[in-house]
Swiss-Prot record:
This is Prokaryotic ubiquitin-like protein Pup. HAMAP family: Pup (MF_02106). Protein modifier that is covalently attached to lysine residues of substrate proteins, thereby targeting them for proteasomal degradation. The tagging system is termed pupylation. There is a cross-link at residue 71 (Isoglutamyl lysine isopeptide (Glu-Lys) (interchain with K-? in acceptor proteins)). It comes from the Bacteria. Strongly interacts with the proteasome-associated ATPase ARC through a hydrophobic interface; the interacting region of Pup lies in its C-terminal half. There is one Pup binding site per ARC hexamer ring. It comes from Acidothermus cellulolyticus (strain ATCC 43068 / DSM 8971 / 11B). One of its GO terms (biological process) is modification-dependent protein catabolic process.
């Protein structure tokens, strides 16, 4: 099958696609970084909440655990 002469347009399209892929990868990397930072902040908040609960209830928890273990 004879190929149609595109006058070099195919090559330009390929470069454009490669450029678009590079931009897409940069955007994806940025999105991933933002998501990671948000998840890190969420995890830190949860751990802080757990620490607060343990500070308030740790002594009671230990007493009930020891009492149950000693029965």
């Amino acid at each position: 099958m004879p190929e149609k002469d595109t006058g070099g347009q195919h090559r330009a399209t390929r470069r454009t696609e490669e450029h678009d892929e590079t931009i897409d990868e940069a955007t994806a990397t940025s999105d991933v970084q933002e998501r990671r930072e948000k998840l890190d902040a969420d995890v830190d908040a949860i751990l802080d909440e757990i620490d607060d609960v343990l500070e308030e209830n740790a002594e009671e928890f230990v007493r009930s655990y020891i009492q149950k273990g000693g029965e």
